[in-house]
Amino acid sequence: MDKQQLAKMIDHTILKPEADKASIEKLCKEALEYNFASVCINPTNVELAAKLLKGSEVKVCTVIGFPLGANTMEVKAFETKDAIAKGADEVDMVINIGRLKDKDYEYVEKDIKAVVDAADKKAVTKVIIETCLLTEEEKVKACELAKKAGADFVKTSTGFSTGGATPEDIKLMRETVGPDMGVKASGGVRSIEDAEAVIKNGATRIGASASIAICEGKVSDSTY
C-alpha cells in the first residue's frame, strides 16, 4: 500500500478540548495536502472545517454523544441533525456503554438507530463501542447491534478512555460484522506498523492525530 492509498483510509483527528481555530486551520491544511479521508473534529468546529474543505475530496467528520456516550438518544439525534446542517459528512457516535453492560440491548439498538435515522443517509454513521471497557462478549454484542441498527461502521475507541485500538479487537469486530461493514481503528495508532497491523486484521478506516507520522513512516508520541 502506497502513501496515497494509506492516507485515504485515515480520519485526520483533533478532538482535544483546547483545539483552537489555528489548530483546525492547520488540520484542514494538512488534510488537503495529504488527501486524507476526512478531518475528525468536535461539533463546534464543523462549520469552519466545512468552509475550509469546500470543493475538496476531504470529508468533515464529527463526534456525537462524545466521549462518554451517556447523553439521551434524543440529544444524540439532535446533535446529528445539527452537525449535518452545519456541514458534517460523517458522524462518529458513542454507544450507551452502561446500558450495554446492563444487557439492555433494545435501548442500545434504539440509541444507535436514533443517530442512523437522524443522519437519514446524508452522512456516514460510525458507532464507537469503546472496546477497552468491554468484555469479548460485549464487543461482539455491540457490533451486532450497530449492524442491526443500520450503521455504516463500527469503531473501537474514543481515544479518551483507558485504551485504544488493538489488532485483536479489530479482528473480532471484522469477524462479527462481516465483509460489508466498515471497521474503524482509533486510539493508539501512531506508526505505519500500527496502521498495517490493524488494516491486516480488517480495518478499513483509521482515526489518528499522528496521521502525517504514519504516512511518512515515522512514530508519533500522540496519545490519540
Curated annotation (Swiss-Prot):
One GO term describing the cellular component: cytoplasm
EC number: 4.1.2.4
Keywords: Cytoplasm, Lyase, Schiff base
Pathways per UniProt: Carbohydrate degradation; 2-deoxy-D-ribose 1-phosphate degradation; D-glyceraldehyde 3-phosphate and acetaldehyde from 2-deoxy-alpha-D-ribose 1-phosphate: step 2/2
InterPro entries associated with the record: Aldolase_TIM, DeoC, DeoC/FbaB/LacD_aldolase, DeoC_typeI
GO annotation terms (biological process): 2-deoxyribose 1-phosphate catabolic process; carbohydrate catabolic process; deoxyribonucleotide catabolic process
This protein's record includes keyword Oxidoreductase: no
Lyase in keyword set: yes
Catalyses which reaction(s): 2-deoxy-D-ribose 5-phosphate = D-glyceraldehyde 3-phosphate + acetaldehyde
Localization: Cytoplasm
Catalytic residue list: 92 (proton donor/acceptor), 155 (schiff-base intermediate with acetaldehyde), 184 (proton donor/acceptor)
GO molecular function: deoxyribose-phosphate aldolase activity
CDD domains: DeoC
Signal peptide limits: none
UniProt xrefs under Pfam families: DeoC (PF01791)
HAMAP family registered for this protein in UniProt: DeoC_type1
Family according to the record: Belongs to the DeoC/FbaB aldolase family. DeoC type 1 subfamily.
Stated role: Catalyzes a reversible aldol reaction between acetaldehyde and D-glyceraldehyde 3-phosphate to generate 2-deoxy-D-ribose 5-phosphate.
Protein name: Deoxyribose-phosphate aldolase
Source organism of this protein record: Clostridium perfringens (strain SM101 / Type A)
